[in-house]
Amino acid sequence: SFAYVPIMQSIAQDADVGTILGAQIVGGIVAIIVGIFIKQIRHLFPPLVTGTVVFAIGLSLYPTAVNYMAGGAGSADYGSWQNWLVAIITLAVVTGLNHFGKGFLKLSSVLIGIIVGYVVALGFGMVDFSSVLTAKWVQFPQPMHFGIKFEPSSCVAIAVLFAISSIQAIGDFSATTTGGMDRMPTDEELSGGIIGYGVSNIVCAFFSGLPTATYSQNVGIVSSTKVVAKRVFGIAAMIMLVAGIMP
């Protein structure tokens, strides 16, 4: 999740990826604790609070987004007009389809924007297929490739973010069940979702995966389609797993 990027960049400069992964495990444990006691603390986080948290997280990502639009830190052509043109075209397509599109076009606005941006970048010769051509068809992740280290200050910083993201999850789950099922989530549903969020991040750390979140952008898709069947999300998860081992 981009919500962790600023903190992870700071940790990476002073330490390494293994330190981030160790802190991620601690953060996952914090999320599990929040999930276990969600029934007792839920009243402390009304929609006004959770909505504000989601909004604040979104605002904090603008510097990272602008940096990526310029080409990414360390890029030889950082800030070039080609980078900005590709970024602006992609942004315009996503925004236009999201606001004015209907049905499939609206739901697929991000995917279509990526495809359009990719085609434009291809025209500028900004796409290098050499790594794709040399990559194996199937490649499994190596557990603990970067190792796992526990550094107190890093653990505290990431743990705080996980606690905040757990509160964001309350807002995400509430908006999802309201939009998809016309009701608020039960305490058991919130607890299971947040505990699952924590467990998945702990497992993810052992496979060198960086922190994830509950992703507010998916709320709109569920609200629009009303699709909440576990089978659908299970199939989507399997597709992602297969994509993960086919770089």
Model-inferred region functions:
Residues 1-2, 43-52, 105-112, 210-218, ...:
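Short, non-helical or kinked segments that cap or interrupt transmembrane helices
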Residues 5, 17-25, 84-89, 107, ...:
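Hydrophobic alpha-helical transmembrane segments
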Residues 9-12, 98, 218-233, 238-244:
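Interfacial segments of multi-pass membrane proteins
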Residues 30-43, 94-103, 170-179, 216-224:
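C-terminal ends of transmembrane helices
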Residues 75-77, 106-191:
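Helix-loop-helix hairpins and the membrane-proximal interhelical loops
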Residues 159-230:
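Membrane-embedded helical hairpins/re-entrant loop segments and their flanking transmembrane helices
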